[in-house]
From Swiss-Prot:
GO terms for molecular function: cysteine-type endopeptidase activity; cysteine-type peptidase activity; peptidase activity. It catalyses: Specificity close to that of papain. As compared to cathepsin B, cathepsin L exhibits higher activity toward protein substrates, but has little activity on Z-Arg-Arg-NHMec, and no peptidyl-dipeptidase activity. The gene is CtsL1. Disulfide bonds join C175-C218, C209-C251, C310-C360. It is an enzyme of class 3 (hydrolase). Residues 49-153, 327-329 form a propeptide. Disruption phenotype: Flies exhibit wing and pigmentation defects. Females are sterile, males are partially sterile. This is Cathepsin L1.
Amino acid sequence: MNHLGVFETRFRPRTRHKSQRAQLIPEQITMRTAVLLPLLALLAVAQAVSFADVVMEEWHTFKLEHRKNYQDETEERFRLKIFNENKHKIAKHNQRFAEGKVSFKLAVNKYADLLHHEFRQLMNGFNYTLHKQLRAADESFKGVTFISPAHVTLPKSVDWRTKGAVTAVKDQGHCGSCWAFSSTGALEGQHFRKSGVLVSLSEQNLVDCSTKYGNNGCNGGLMDNAFRYIKDNGGIDTEKSYPYEAIDDSCHFNKGTVGATDRGFTDIPQGDEKKMAEAVATVGPVSVAIDASHESFQFYSEGVYNEPQCDAQNLDHGVLVVGFGTDESGEDYWLVKNSWGTTWGDKGFIKMLRNKENQCGIASASSYPLV
């Protein structure tokens, strides 16, 4: 036998009999299982603890950022549950946005701890049924009808913010005074166009003092009623002299601190988006009422808002159209200023679908004051 053969023989590894190996395998599996199962259990616990920590950290940040305080521990647990449910809905919608199935994103905002019906009761204060009833019963509730200007070609886009005609985004708080903010916004724009001076006007003046004109303070009102009050009253006070409180208070209008006045208002033909675009382009910001009754509006963040469930007759929220345009995908939109603060939407604004059969009723009740 050669040296190689000797080497192979001397150093050949010992082998176990087949039956011995068969006995060893179950023992090895049992030992490995005994080691792995506790490790897996620890890992699962660690992940669960980690997830719970993340959730509570998000909740803590939310409460801190939006200054949330609850009556007791029971209410806080209830609000945390709503917060987590809303977060799940938002994440689900945004996954559809990432897949290109919807044209706008949602985000957690200060309303994330509210049930949707609570949110609607608190924030949406426009009554379209009352609007129609008043106009049908009395001609004085109707304004001058808008007539298209001659020889005007509509621009591709308009943004009155860049022209200095729009005040900073305001916050109505937990008060259904959207109609007052829409009214002041339109008059602020018209006053600026006439005087060249942008003056922030008092929503609280309208909340407190225009009840005889059919408005109901924090429980809702109509922009046209506000314009009628301002005309008959000889003006509206400045925001600085009559600051916002987000409650119904006694009227303390002061003629010495009037910021602007009007001499009536103009109504744009119902449902006519083309005429409304002409008014926005040539006149300035326009008061409108919309259907804002959907959760998608509550948590809107960016993109062109396209809500197929919107109703052109179910109008419950007053806002201000400050421009229009077309986005990079070719979608026409209205540029709308809301009154829910800068943490809502796109820094307080929303792009709403334009030229799509009057979606959300944006052209159903539009008007602006005459100055």
